Design a protein with these regions (language model features):
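Acidic/aromatic/glycine-rich contiguous surface patches that form carbohydrate-binding/processing clefts
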Residues: 214
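Extended intrinsically disordered or low-complexity regions, especially N/C-terminal cytosolic tails and loops
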Residues: 1-206, 218-296
């Protein structure tokens, strides 16, 4: 059983004193105060945990500098922006491909028909969430639809799927009963089986939320492991010794999915980001030792 929390709020200057007492080197106290006033102590704490020698006493390793923590934070912030840009492209394409392949064969309202679901309970849950997400939408094409039509209760799939969340979209795809249609969508992204695409969509929804809510990516353990095919039709990875719940495999599949657009500069942009932040260690992202020798 836990104990009552009794700590009081302290000033930014007092926070700086605590960090100094724990062995962190702070060259410019004034800049450090400004940084903490903008970023906040506990948001940065997730980044400096890697620099601690002891996670119980929170003593820092010898030679650790506040500037290195800020550099890691800055790298992480820019990486989120890079990923979010790629995910936006992927997300729009996924919606379009699912609408295209499912609607032509299964109609405009397949998402409301439990005959197209593998699990009835998940179908009911998904539909309830879709209703709420559509109700919350203020997009012109949704409000205009309801102004004109009152049946069925929801707009057709080519409107509805544009306003549901990435997580809901992932669950809809996963619970769809027709494997042939799911394969068709997966093949649009260069995958030979929908099980990989289903897994990647689930991971993508989590990763998207991390980026959208400014959550830390480096040194993070993700809740879902992406299924990684050993062979692909184009250049892919050969070393699968990485830790599955780190960012590295997610970066790999984001690059692959983003290849649906011709101007895919994701790897080039990522490498440039690493060059701009030489103090950042790729092992914090789960990269294998010889990642630069990978075909991808």
């Amino acid at each position: 059983m836990g104990v009552r929390y009794t700590n009081r709020a302290i000033t930014t200057e007092q926070q700086i004193d605590i960090l100094k007492e724990r062995g962190l080197l702070i060259d410019d106290v004034e800049r450090a105060v400004k940084a903490l006033d903008i970023i906040s102590y506990f948001r940065l704490a997730g980044y400096w945990r890697h620099f601690e020698a002891d996670h119980t006493t929170h003593q820092f390793r010898e030679g650790c500098r506040f500037a290195d923590i800020i550099d890691l934070y800055s790298f992480d912030k820019q990486l989120r922006a890079l990923l979010f840009t790629a995910i936006q492209t992927i997300e729009v394409a996924v919606r379009t491909k699912i609408i295209k392949h499912f609607a032509l064969e299964f109609g405009a309202f397949w998402f409301m028909d439990e005959n197209f679901a593998t699990n009835e309970a998940r179908f009911a849950t998904n539909l309830a969430v879709i209703r709420k997400e559509v109700e919350r939408s203020h997009d012109d094409f949704i409000t205009e639809h309801f102004r004109k039509y009152n049946e069925p209760e929801l707009p057709p799939v080519w409107k509805t799927l544009e306003v549901i969340s990435m997580g809901t979209l992932s669950k809809l795809y996963s619970n769809f009963s027709n494997a042939t249609a799911k394969h068709a969508v997966a093949r649009e992204f260069g995958l030979n089986h929908h099980k990989f695409f289903r897994s990647w969509l689930e991971c993508l929804a989590v990763l998207r939320n991390c980026c959208a809510h400014h959550s830390r990516l480096s040194n993070r353990v993700f809740p879902v492991k992406p299924k990684m095919p050993e062979r692909m039709p184009n250049t892919w990875i050969a070393d699968f010794s990485f830790r599955e719940q780190t960012l590295y495999p997610q970066l790999c599949f984001v690059y692959w999915l983003n290849s649906i657009v011709l101007e895919n500069t994701f790897i080039t942009d990522f490498k440039q980001l690493l060059i701009s932040h030489p103090s950042v260690k790729t092992r914090l992202l789960g990269f294998p030792r010889n990642w630069e020798q990978e075909p991808l």
